[in-house]
Amino acid sequence: MVEDVAIVGYLPGEAGRYIADLVRAHVPAVPVRRPHITFMPGRPPALPDAELLRRLRQRAQNFLPLELTLGEVRNFLPLSPVLYLDVVAGMAGLDQLRRVLLEATENSHPERFPFHPHLTLAYDQSPEEILALQPRLQAGWAKYPGPRRLRFTQLMLVRQTGPASWQDLGSAAMPGME
Protein backbone atom coordinates (compact mmCIF):
# COMPACT_ATOMS: atom_id res chain seq x y z
CA MET A 1 0.00 0.00 0.00
CA VAL A 2 1.32 3.45 -0.96
CA GLU A 3 0.80 6.09 1.70
CA ASP A 4 -0.31 9.62 0.88
CA VAL A 5 2.14 12.48 0.54
CA ALA A 6 1.46 16.10 1.49
CA ILE A 7 3.31 19.41 1.55
CA VAL A 8 3.28 21.42 4.76
CA GLY A 9 4.93 24.43 6.37
CA TYR A 10 5.96 24.01 10.00
CA LEU A 11 5.20 26.94 12.27
CA PRO A 12 8.38 28.83 13.02
CA GLY A 13 9.82 29.63 16.43
CA GLU A 14 7.85 30.61 19.47
CA ALA A 15 4.44 30.32 17.78
CA GLY A 16 5.04 26.65 17.01
CA ARG A 17 6.19 25.89 20.55
CA TYR A 18 3.28 27.80 22.10
CA ILE A 19 0.65 26.02 20.00
CA ALA A 20 2.18 22.58 20.66
CA ASP A 21 2.11 23.28 24.42
CA LEU A 22 -1.47 24.62 24.20
CA VAL A 23 -2.69 21.48 22.44
CA ARG A 24 -0.75 19.19 24.79
CA ALA A 25 -2.36 20.90 27.81
CA HIS A 26 -5.96 20.74 26.54
CA VAL A 27 -6.09 17.67 24.27
CA PRO A 28 -3.80 15.14 25.99
CA ALA A 29 -5.46 12.09 24.38
CA VAL A 30 -4.41 13.14 20.88
CA PRO A 31 -0.74 12.86 19.89
CA VAL A 32 0.69 16.33 19.28
CA ARG A 33 2.12 16.67 15.81
CA ARG A 34 4.45 19.51 14.99
CA PRO A 35 2.16 22.52 14.34
CA HIS A 36 1.90 23.18 10.62
CA ILE A 37 -0.16 24.63 7.80
CA THR A 38 -0.96 22.17 5.04
CA PHE A 39 -0.23 23.63 1.60
CA MET A 40 -1.13 20.47 -0.33
CA PRO A 41 -3.34 17.94 1.53
CA GLY A 42 -2.41 14.27 1.55
CA ARG A 43 -3.02 12.33 -1.63
CA PRO A 44 -1.53 9.31 -3.39
CA PRO A 45 1.80 10.25 -5.00
CA ALA A 46 1.93 10.43 -8.80
CA LEU A 47 5.75 10.39 -8.86
CA PRO A 48 8.58 8.74 -6.89
CA ASP A 49 9.66 10.57 -3.72
CA ALA A 50 13.01 11.67 -5.16
CA GLU A 51 11.32 13.24 -8.20
CA LEU A 52 8.66 14.92 -6.04
CA LEU A 53 11.36 16.42 -3.85
CA ARG A 54 13.44 17.55 -6.85
CA ARG A 55 10.42 19.30 -8.36
CA LEU A 56 9.42 20.82 -5.04
CA ARG A 57 12.91 22.28 -4.55
CA GLN A 58 13.00 23.59 -8.12
CA ARG A 59 9.60 25.32 -7.83
CA ALA A 60 10.25 26.69 -4.33
CA GLN A 61 13.17 28.75 -5.68
CA ASN A 62 10.65 30.94 -7.51
CA PHE A 63 8.74 31.89 -4.36
CA LEU A 64 9.31 34.53 -1.77
CA PRO A 65 8.71 33.45 1.81
CA LEU A 66 5.00 33.10 2.49
CA GLU A 67 3.47 35.32 5.16
CA LEU A 68 0.26 34.05 6.73
CA THR A 69 -1.75 35.46 9.61
CA LEU A 70 -3.52 33.16 12.07
CA GLY A 71 -6.97 34.14 13.31
CA GLU A 72 -9.36 32.59 15.78
CA VAL A 73 -10.12 29.03 16.89
CA ARG A 74 -12.89 27.61 14.70
CA ASN A 75 -14.41 24.21 13.95
CA PHE A 76 -15.48 22.30 10.85
CA LEU A 77 -18.71 20.98 12.41
CA PRO A 78 -20.97 19.45 11.22
CA LEU A 79 -18.79 18.39 8.28
CA SER A 80 -15.86 17.17 10.38
CA PRO A 81 -15.10 17.17 14.13
CA VAL A 82 -11.93 19.28 13.91
CA LEU A 83 -10.80 22.39 15.79
CA TYR A 84 -8.39 24.68 14.00
CA LEU A 85 -6.78 28.10 13.84
CA ASP A 86 -8.04 29.96 10.80
CA VAL A 87 -5.66 31.54 8.28
CA VAL A 88 -7.03 35.07 7.83
CA ALA A 89 -4.41 36.80 5.67
CA GLY A 90 -1.89 35.78 3.03
CA MET A 91 -4.32 33.84 0.87
CA ALA A 92 -3.20 35.25 -2.50
CA GLY A 93 0.34 33.95 -2.05
CA LEU A 94 -0.93 30.65 -0.70
CA ASP A 95 -3.32 30.13 -3.63
CA GLN A 96 -0.51 30.78 -6.11
CA LEU A 97 1.80 28.39 -4.25
CA ARG A 98 -0.88 25.67 -4.20
CA ARG A 99 -1.41 25.88 -7.95
CA VAL A 100 2.32 25.47 -8.56
CA LEU A 101 2.56 22.57 -6.08
CA LEU A 102 -0.33 20.71 -7.68
CA GLU A 103 1.21 21.16 -11.14
CA ALA A 104 4.70 20.18 -9.96
CA THR A 105 3.48 16.98 -8.31
CA GLU A 106 1.34 16.03 -11.33
CA ASN A 107 -1.42 15.22 -8.92
CA SER A 108 -5.00 15.31 -10.13
CA HIS A 109 -6.64 13.47 -7.22
CA PRO A 110 -9.69 15.37 -5.95
CA GLU A 111 -9.57 16.66 -2.40
CA ARG A 112 -11.94 15.15 0.17
CA PHE A 113 -13.02 18.59 1.32
CA PRO A 114 -12.76 22.05 -0.24
CA PHE A 115 -9.33 23.47 0.61
CA HIS A 116 -9.49 25.75 3.64
CA PRO A 117 -6.05 26.72 4.98
CA HIS A 118 -5.83 26.20 8.70
CA LEU A 119 -3.76 24.84 11.56
CA THR A 120 -5.37 21.76 13.13
CA LEU A 121 -5.59 21.86 16.92
CA ALA A 122 -7.85 18.89 17.76
CA TYR A 123 -9.34 15.98 15.83
CA ASP A 124 -10.66 12.47 16.50
CA GLN A 125 -13.01 13.87 19.13
CA SER A 126 -16.79 13.75 19.32
CA PRO A 127 -18.68 16.87 18.20
CA GLU A 128 -19.55 17.50 21.86
CA GLU A 129 -15.88 17.32 22.87
CA ILE A 130 -14.93 19.67 20.03
CA LEU A 131 -17.52 22.23 21.18
CA ALA A 132 -16.32 21.93 24.80
CA LEU A 133 -12.66 22.34 23.80
CA GLN A 134 -13.18 25.33 21.52
CA PRO A 135 -13.55 28.06 24.19
CA ARG A 136 -10.61 26.68 26.20
CA LEU A 137 -8.29 26.64 23.20
CA GLN A 138 -9.50 30.09 22.14
CA ALA A 139 -8.79 31.45 25.63
CA GLY A 140 -5.31 29.93 25.54
CA TRP A 141 -4.62 31.28 22.05
CA ALA A 142 -5.81 34.75 23.13
CA LYS A 143 -2.98 34.76 25.71
CA TYR A 144 -0.28 34.20 23.09
CA PRO A 145 1.94 37.31 23.32
CA GLY A 146 3.69 36.97 19.97
CA PRO A 147 2.78 38.03 16.45
CA ARG A 148 -0.01 36.21 14.62
CA ARG A 149 1.60 36.96 11.27
CA LEU A 150 4.11 34.20 10.54
CA ARG A 151 6.74 33.89 7.84
CA PHE A 152 7.18 30.50 6.19
CA THR A 153 10.54 30.01 4.47
CA GLN A 154 10.44 26.24 3.93
CA LEU A 155 8.15 23.66 2.44
CA MET A 156 8.29 20.10 3.77
CA LEU A 157 7.31 17.01 1.78
CA VAL A 158 5.80 14.46 4.19
CA ARG A 159 4.50 10.89 3.86
CA GLN A 160 1.67 9.43 5.91
CA THR A 161 2.92 6.37 7.79
CA GLY A 162 -0.18 5.72 9.92
CA PRO A 163 -3.58 7.17 10.82
CA ALA A 164 -2.06 10.21 12.59
CA SER A 165 1.60 9.75 11.74
CA TRP A 166 3.66 11.59 9.12
CA GLN A 167 7.34 11.31 8.20
CA ASP A 168 9.42 14.19 6.83
CA LEU A 169 10.88 13.25 3.43
CA GLY A 170 12.74 16.47 2.67
CA SER A 171 12.48 20.23 2.64
CA ALA A 172 12.60 22.94 0.02
CA ALA A 173 13.74 26.46 0.86
CA MET A 174 12.03 29.55 -0.48
CA PRO A 175 14.29 32.62 -1.02
CA GLY A 176 15.00 34.60 2.10
CA MET A 177 15.54 31.55 4.29
CA GLU A 178 18.01 32.26 7.06
Predicted regions and their residues:
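Basic, often amphipathic N-terminal segments
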Residues: 1-69, 75, 87-146, 163-178
